[in-house]
């Protein structure tokens, strides 16, 4: 019997892609599958999202894995290439690349490639992490437009820094700046991330780039996927391996950081930080057992976690426990732990069995 299982609902993946299309019906879709498809499995997810127009990854290794498994649709490297030595690999595998530094531009100009590559000029409109600044743009695009190793016209993209904060003016300012800077350019444009797709329709350009919403996670604080008709794709579950009577005044686990104030029954579930469940999960973090929410108690161990089933509980070893997913939104769990759902879903270890349904 497998201990920890991440059940991946492929029908939910397709449903969430349909939600994206409903919000941006005139746009082409770049499905973001970086970081092992946000922890959901790169190849199975890409194969499920066959109705996307392209894929985006962060690392060239991810792109090459897709190509080696007969994925032929366009693939965009969101961070671009890291070395001039990568360029022949990009050209040979028909990979598209972001371009955001002078060093990348110089490498493109000097390369000897069998065919030009599709390039996405990444503009810094306010994220201030990657991208060409507005004052650098005229000189940069003059050279990029003349580069023999770039398919012309080149495309343009940017990335939002606060699109999940609807009350902040930053996203509006980024949209306006990007629109102004790119108005004279002929290439295709991409602005909208997950939050942009749902909340900022003015950011819908030729392309949109859904990420976390494809996996049934809300990009906004204090909300859950269902608020936007999204369905959770990952359900992380395990089983009770022991049910024990526990007396008032007794602690449980390393460090004795939880002491029961009543006689109760505790359940031990087969998951821990060795599986990627966060050790920092505090007492009270919700776990779903037999259809009801019970609190995590005691410190998360490498292989086990303890929950308070309550006095007189009839749960037994072998019963299912859900850590997040169907019936227990990952957003709620992340809030309790003090992190973001992105971190939870991307940090599962290889010990967790991936089950696709």
UniProtKB/Swiss-Prot annotation:
- What's the top EC group for this one? isomerase
Query: What InterPro entries does the record point to?
Result: Ala_racemase, Ala_racemase/Decarboxylase_C, Ala_racemase_C, Ala_racemase_N, Ala_racemase_pyridoxalP-BS, PLP-binding_barrel
What's the catalysed reaction? Answer: L-alanine = D-alanine
GO terms for MF? alanine racemase activity; pyridoxal phosphate binding
Q: Which GO terms describe its cellular component?
A: cytosol
* Keywords, comma-separated and alphabetical: Isomerase, Pyridoxal phosphate
Pathway(s): Amino-acid biosynthesis; D-alanine biosynthesis; D-alanine from L-alanine: step 1/1
Modified residues annotated as N6-(pyridoxal phosphate)lysine in this record? 34
Annotated binding of substrate, by residue: 129, 302
For activity, the cofactor(s) needed are: pyridoxal 5'-phosphate
Highest taxon, organism lineage: Bacteria
Whether Metal-binding counts among this entry's keywords is no
| GO biological process assignments | D-alanine biosynthetic process
Entry keyword annotation includes Isomerase: yes
Active-site positions on this chain = 34, 254
As recorded in UniProt, its EC number(s) are 5.1.1.1
Record's SUPFAM superfamilies?
Answer: Alanine racemase C-terminal domain-like, PLP-binding barrel
Q: Which PANTHER family does this entry report, sorted A to Z? A: ALANINE RACEMASE, ALANINE RACEMASE, BIOSYNTHETIC
Q: Which family does it belong to?
A: Belongs to the alanine racemase family.
What is this protein's function per UniProt?
Catalyzes the interconversion of L-alanine and D-alanine. Likely plays an important role in supplying D-alanine, which is an indispensable constituent in the biosynthesis of bacterial cell-wall peptidoglycan.
Record's protein name: Alanine racemase
Which organism is the protein's source? Aeromonas hydrophila subsp. hydrophila (strain ATCC 7966 / DSM 30187 / BCRC 13018 / CCUG 14551 / JCM 1027 / KCTC 2358 / NCIMB 9240 / NCTC 8049)
